[in-house]
From Swiss-Prot:
CDD domains: HFD_H3. The nucleosome is a histone octamer containing two molecules each of H2A, H2B, H3 and H4 assembled in one H3-H4 heterotetramer and two H2A-H2B heterodimers. The octamer wraps approximately 147 bp of DNA. It comes from Leishmania infantum. Keywords: Chromosome, DNA-binding, Nucleosome core, Nucleus. This is Histone H3. Core component of nucleosome. Nucleosomes wrap and compact DNA into chromatin, limiting DNA accessibility to the cellular machineries which require DNA as a template. Histones thereby play a central role in transcription regulation, DNA repair, DNA replication and chromosomal stability. DNA accessibility is regulated via a complex set of post-translational modifications of histones, also called histone code, and nucleosome remodeling. It comes from the Eukaryota. It holds the Pfam family Histone.
Length: 129
């Protein structure tokens, strides 16, 4: 096996514990925290959620909502698998509605969605008169 060439390393200076501590005058100066540019975290979140296949609505609150509707109707019962199917369908509907809403917002030359964008998306789908 051939030998690999080693490069010289810079020497480390050995310092005592006392010299490692910052001087008493410099301890009051705080370093500023680096912030991300506006929109960077949002884009990172969007990419993260688009990659994942997990459910976004928490299971317990959604199940409580379904059970509340179930209590209003007599003789209506749901299996846990039926509730999971309802949750999948609900999330798919909300995601597609938000995609249409975003298109309406972009069409209006805005970047922030507003209630009127959701109303327009619902009207174009024929779900609201």
């Amino acid at each position: 096996m051939s030998r690999t060439k080693e490069t010289a390393r810079a020497k480390r200076t050995i310092t005592s514990k006392k010299s490692k501590k910052a001087p008493s005058g410099a301890s009051g100066v705080k370093r500023s925290h680096r912030r991300w540019r506006p929109g960077t975290c949002a884009i990172r979140e969007i990419r993260k959620f688009q990659k994942s296949t997990s459910l976004l609505i928490q299971c317990a609150p959604f199940q409580r909502l379904v059970r509340g509707v179930e209590r209003q109707k007599e003789g209506l019962r749901f299996q846990s698998s039926a509730i999971m199917a309802l949750q999948e369908a609900t999330e798919a509907y909300i995601v597609s509605l938000m995609a249409d809403t975003n298109l309406a917002c972009i069409h209006a030359k805005r970047v922030t969605i507003q209630p009127k964008d959701i109303q327009l998306a619902l009207r174009l789908r024929g779900e609201r008169h």
